[in-house]
């Protein structure tokens, strides 16, 4: 998911440099959403992994 966030950030930067303001804003918005969604999912999985590891051990 972070990979897609980086891809959309690059698309946004290129579109902004070429003068496509609306498309650049949309791409950066998608990149921000994907980045934070990836971080939240990673934290949730980390917490679940730690709690399940305690039950297994």
Swiss-Prot record:
Could you tell me where this protein is found in the cell?
Answer: Cell membrane
Q: Name one GO cellular component term.
A: plasma membrane
Cystine bridges: none
Q: Which residues are the signal sequence here?
A: none
Keywords recorded for this protein, A-Z: Cell membrane, Membrane, Transmembrane, Transmembrane helix
Q: What is its main location?
A: membrane
Transmembrane stretches, by residue range?
Answer: 4-24, 33-53
Q: How does it sit in the membrane?
A: Multi-pass membrane protein
Q: Which family does it belong to?
A: Belongs to the UPF0391 family.
Q: Which HAMAP family match?
A: UPF0391
- Identify this protein by name: UPF0391 membrane protein XOO1885
Organism encoding this protein: Xanthomonas oryzae pv. oryzae (strain KACC10331 / KXO85)
């Amino acid at each position: 998911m972070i990979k897609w966030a980086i891809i959309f950030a690059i698309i946004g930067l290129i579109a902004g440099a070429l003068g496509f303001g609306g498309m650049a804003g949309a791409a950066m918005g998608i990149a921000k959403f994907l980045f934070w969604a990836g971080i939240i999912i990673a934290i949730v999985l980390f917490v679940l992994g730690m709690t399940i590891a305690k039950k297994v051990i």
